[in-house]
């Protein structure tokens, strides 16, 4: 059964379609404390998600991570022993991809957030670059987050875990996710042999390829990390014009999901 990776049935009911709990990183190791300066820990209505800082005032996450009360934490590694330069923000404004009957639910799983106050670059905080071009098949990419590290149990680590996965032929995902269009605004990524994947607690986090954010954690198999069941990531490159337009102040073409 396909579920968007979130932690609560409440959000599943709110979105009105089957989704998987917020993802974790299965099969990974603790991230180096200096390799995730852009990574955001998102708490929203009791749900844990991830996000990505793209400049001092803006960040990206998944639309299905939206909630009434969102707390955004920057510069975090250990949740129990926070870095001294950790900063906390809340959304000033949230933007969703424009409504369109030409796109599936997966194509629209992106949220652009303007922070209530800009964050300051520091030892553990810095933005990640937007993509200059889309990744090609077989590109090795990185996933990361504080999500559960077990495909069958909710075991949440104190520190973020990282793993490498590959961009997979989109036909593999179309075979597993009914209704996924050939020209979908998504990326298919994973390890076809299984063993490495995002899972509960990492929805909205980044798929990083060649030092750029290429994807946003969206949908995956249940349980996680199964063979021949790669995950779907919202394709950031296909939303670039919209992202840049919003940041530039053109908000006319948006509507809530």
From Swiss-Prot:
EC number: 3.4.21.-
Active site feature: 64 (charge relay system), 109 (charge relay system), 203 (charge relay system)
BP GO terms, sorted: proteolysis
Disulphide connectivity of cysteines: 31-162, 49-65, 141-209, 173-188, 199-224
Residue stretch(es) of the prosequence: 19-24
Domain Peptidase S1, first and last residues per copy: 25-248
Molecular function, one GO term: serine-type endopeptidase activity
Broad EC category: hydrolase
SUPFAM superfamilies referenced in this protein's UniProt entry, alphabetically: Trypsin-like serine proteases (SSF50494)
Xref: InterPro entries: Peptidase_S1_PA, Peptidase_S1_PA_chymotrypsin, Peptidase_S1A, Trypsin_dom, TRYPSIN_HIS
Top-level taxon of the source organism: Eukaryota
Signal peptide interval: 1-18
Gene Ontology, cellular component aspect: extracellular region; secretory granule
UniProt key word Hydrolase: yes
Glycosylation sites recorded in the entry for this protein: 102, 120-121
Tissues of expression: Expressed by the venom gland.
Location relative to the cell: Secreted
Keywords carried by this UniProt record: Disulfide bond, Glycoprotein, Hemostasis impairing toxin, Hydrolase, Protease, Secreted, Serine protease, Signal, Toxin, Zymogen
Keyword Glycoprotein: yes
UniProt function note: Snake venom serine protease that may act in the hemostasis system of the prey.
Similarity remark: Belongs to the peptidase S1 family. Snake venom subfamily.
UniProt subunit comment: Monomer.
Name of this protein: Snake venom serine protease KN10
Species the sequence originates in: Trimeresurus stejnegeri (Chinese green tree viper)
């Amino acid at each position: 059964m396909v579920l968007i990776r979130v932690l609560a049935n409440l959000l599943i009911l709110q979105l009105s379609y089957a989704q998987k709990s917020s993802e974790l990183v299965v099969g990974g190791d603790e991230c180096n404390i200096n390799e995730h300066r852009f990574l955001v820990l998102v708490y929203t209505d009791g749900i844990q998600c991830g996000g990505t800082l793209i400049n001092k005032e803006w960040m990206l996450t998944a639309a299905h991570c939206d909630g009434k009360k969102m707390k955004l934490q920057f510069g975090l590694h250990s949740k129990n022993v926070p870095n001294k330069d950790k900063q906390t923000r809340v959304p000033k404004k949230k933007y969703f991809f424009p409504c369109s009957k030409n796109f599936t639910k997966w194509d629209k799983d992106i949220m652009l957030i303007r922070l209530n106050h800009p964050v300051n670059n520091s030892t553990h905080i810095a933005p990640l670059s937007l993509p200059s071009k889309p990744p090609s098949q077989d590109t090795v990419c990185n996933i990361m987050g504080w999500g559960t590290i077990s495909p069958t149990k909710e075991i949440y680590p104190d520190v973020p875990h990282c793993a490498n996965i590959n961009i997979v032929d989109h036909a593999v995902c179309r075979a597993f996710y009914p209704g996924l269009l050939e020209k979908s605004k998504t990326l298919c990524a994973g390890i076809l042999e299984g063993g490495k994947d995002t899972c509960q607690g990492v929805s909205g986090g980044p798929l990083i390829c060649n030092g750029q954010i290429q994807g946003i954690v969206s949908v995956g198999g249940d349980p996680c990390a199964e063979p021949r069941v790669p995950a779907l990531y919202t394709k950031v490159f296909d939303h670039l014009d919209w992202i840049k337009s919003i940041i530039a102040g053109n908000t006319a073409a948006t509507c809530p999901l």
